[in-house]
């Protein structure tokens, strides 16, 4: 069975891993890094992903970051006159990770387990699955990030019974999950979170502070200057990381703007204490879901055996201190917060292929599910933190006499009124026979699969007529749209590959021109002048083809020149060997003469020892 890769599709960074020899291993990208920035840039019809895209973000307005924050919404980003959905941008990142995995494994990769924040709703999960399909991946399972982290942590500790709290603060989302580990079973008891809280917000408080300080000093608002803002973002992210290791950092941005007197520079010292003051409310916002998760699990902090920190933002000292204060436990530092989620996804991939045995994962739905009933009330059918997969049915009736149809309004959330919760979808059950209100019996059934994706059925128990939908949110893509995007993604991947091959061909041609010059110079006066002239002529023809940028001509001229250069190189080696042979013969003669002159024959007699 082919390998199933594990992918942590992050807000700021992504990571891919695979099971090898019973162990999950992170797959490095072509630059040798173990994580890849979740950044996509478009430049001259070329798509760039990762570090190369992030590096040119200051000068390229067609750079997209933190697209994960828009998953499951109808947000679109316009690039060079074309609109892209968050699923399409995420698919470009996934294609890049897929290519890294294929290069590492040396075989095609078609299946993946992709992680999502535990607090992702149905629309966000569907969008993630669609992104995988567009990237050419069969998404075998969607699993929650904290659960994946627990899988990676607990793989070697299956014989220990323990309750663990996973505190996952990533680039754009925050989750906390509480799990019980026992006999290879990883059971999630509760989960809570905030999908609008992460490392980006910590960067933002530094950016806001820098903008305010610069405005106070120079009366210029840098937030209105896109290029300056991107430089501020890069500086803020670097300062945040620096302050995890030192107590003070220097932020220096020369020529950030210009005033009447000339260029203006931003120079500022930021202390860890000031950063902690600026971000105090963000740290506090992580504690409320932590308390809620403990309450839902029916546990107190003292019942916990381990607290595991996941996500790059948990390196912030104030965050570590806050969770230590809240739980009374020193956070466990034995996992890499940037990689552990991808490793856990790879473990789940191994479970699905049978490479990992004796592991059972029981996850929960993060939000309650239900329908709108009379008076705009939200009636829950499945409570949050219910173990999935699960199914639940309830019988409802009509609200008016002779009502011919019922509208089923499917919602997800915790508020008592329907209007305050997230709409997942609507559908209609029609052809209900005329009857007084309250008589028809309409059975509504909710199914949640192992990916946390919802299916809803409504059935008239009198006629057995049934209507069913898989939830499609306003951002949900139809099969036709996904197919179209898959074809576009494949075409773009082919175009990217072709562009790469073109660049490689030009590089090889340039290298050959340089090599020819060197060979011709080395052979000057050593071979027939006609042969040198032939090589020079072929080299000039190749240079002309390179300047014309005619790829077919470059290929043909390169092949022709390569053959000539090979023949000349053979002659060069033959001459070198002939010269070496002559030198050796000369040396041997000299040695023979030396022997006759200097060697003296000596007499010796055997001395026998007395016995």
From Swiss-Prot:
Residues 600-611 have a biased composition (Acidic residues). It holds the Pfam family HSP70. Keywords: ATP-binding, Chaperone, Nucleotide-binding, Phosphoprotein, Stress response. Coiled coil: none annotated. InterPro entries: ATPase_NBD, Chaperone_DnaK, Heat_shock_70_CS, HSP70_C_sf, HSP70_peptide-bd_sf, Hsp_70_fam. It comes from the Bacteria. Residues 581-611 are annotated as: Disordered. The keyword Signal does not apply. One of its GO terms (molecular function) is ATP-dependent protein folding chaperone. Residues 581-594 have a biased composition (Low complexity). The modification Phosphothreonine is found at residue 173. Induction: By stress conditions e.g. heat shock. Belongs to the heat shock protein 70 family. Acts as a chaperone. This is Chaperone protein DnaK. It comes from Bacillus cytotoxicus (strain DSM 22905 / CIP 110041 / 391-98 / NVH 391-98).
């Amino acid at each position: 069975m082919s390998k199933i890769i594990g992918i942590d599709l992050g807000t700021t960074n992504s990571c891919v891993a695979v099971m090898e020899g019973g162990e999950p291993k992170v797959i490095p990208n072509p630059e040798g890094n173990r994580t890849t920035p979740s950044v996509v840039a478009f430049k001259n019809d070329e798509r760039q992903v990762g570090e190369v895209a992030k590096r040119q973000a200051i000068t390229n307005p067609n750079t997209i970051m933190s697209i994960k924050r828009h998953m499951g919404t109808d947000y679109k980003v316009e690039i060079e006159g074309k609109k892209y959905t968050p699923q399409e941008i995420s698919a470009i990142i996934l294609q890049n990770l897929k290519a890294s995995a294929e290069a590492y494994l040396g075989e095609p990769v078609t299946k993946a387990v992709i992680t999502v924040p535990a607090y992702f709703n149905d629309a966000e999960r569907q969008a993630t699955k669609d992104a995988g399909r567009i990237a050419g991946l069969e998404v075998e399972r969607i699993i929650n990030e904290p659960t994946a982290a627990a899988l990676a942590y607990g793989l070697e500790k299956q014989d220990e019974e323990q309750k663990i709290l996973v505190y996952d603060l990533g680039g754009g989302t925050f989750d906390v999950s509480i799990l019980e580990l026992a006999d290879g079973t990883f059971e999630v008891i509760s989960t809570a979170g905030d999908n609008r809280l992460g490392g980006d917000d910590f960067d933002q408080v530094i950016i806001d502070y820098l903008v305010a300080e610069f405005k106070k000093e120079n009366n210029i608002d840098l937030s209105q200057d896109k290029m300056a803002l991107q430089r501020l973002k890069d500086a803020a992210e670097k300062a945040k990381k620096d302050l995890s290791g030192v107590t003070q950092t220097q932020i220096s941005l020369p020529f950030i703007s210009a005033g009447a007197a000339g260029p203006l520079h931003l120079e500022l010292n930021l202390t860890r204490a000031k950063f902690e003051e600026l971000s105090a409310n963000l740290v506090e916002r992580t504690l409320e879901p932590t308390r809620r998760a403990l309450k839902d699990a029916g546990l107190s902090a003292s019942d916990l055996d381990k607290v595991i920190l996941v996500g790059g933002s948990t390196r912030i000292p104030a965050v570590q201190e806050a969770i230590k204060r809240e739980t009374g436990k020193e956070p466990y530092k034995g996992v890499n917060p940037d990689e552990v989620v991808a490793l856990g996804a790879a473990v789940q991939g191994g479970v699905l292929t049978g490479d990992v045995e004796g592991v059972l994962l029981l996850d929960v739905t993060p939000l309650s599910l239900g329908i709108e009933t009379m008076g705009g009330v939200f009636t829950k059918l499945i409570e949050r933190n219910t173990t999935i997969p699960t199914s639940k049915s309830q019988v409802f009736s009509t609200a008016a006499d002779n009502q011919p149809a019922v509208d089923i309004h499917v919602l997800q959330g915790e508020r008592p009124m329907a209007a305050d919760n997230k709409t997942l979808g609507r559908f209609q059950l029609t052809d209900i026979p005329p009857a007084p209100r309250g008589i028809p019996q309409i059975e509504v059934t909710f199914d949640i699969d192992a990916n946390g994706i919802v299916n809803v059925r409504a059935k008239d128990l009198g006629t057995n007529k049934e209507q069913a939908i898989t939830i499609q949110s306003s951002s949900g893509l139809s099969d036709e749209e996904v197919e179209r995007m898959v074809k576009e993604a494949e075409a773009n991947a082919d175009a990217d590959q072709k562009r790469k091959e073109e660049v490689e061909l030009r590089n090889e041609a340039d290298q050959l021109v340089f090599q020819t010059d060197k060979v011709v110079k080395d052979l000057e006066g050593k071979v027939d002048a006609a042969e040198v002239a032939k090589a020079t002529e072929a080299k000039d023809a190749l240079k002309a083809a390179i300047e014309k940028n005619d790829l077919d001509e470059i290929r043909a001229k390169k092949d022709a020149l390569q053959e000539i250069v090979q023949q000349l190189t053979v002659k060069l080696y033959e001459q070198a060997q002939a010269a070496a042979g002559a030198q050796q013969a000369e040396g041997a003669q000299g040695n023979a003469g030396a022997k006759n002159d200097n060697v003296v024959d000596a007499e010796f007699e055997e001395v026998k020892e007395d016995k």
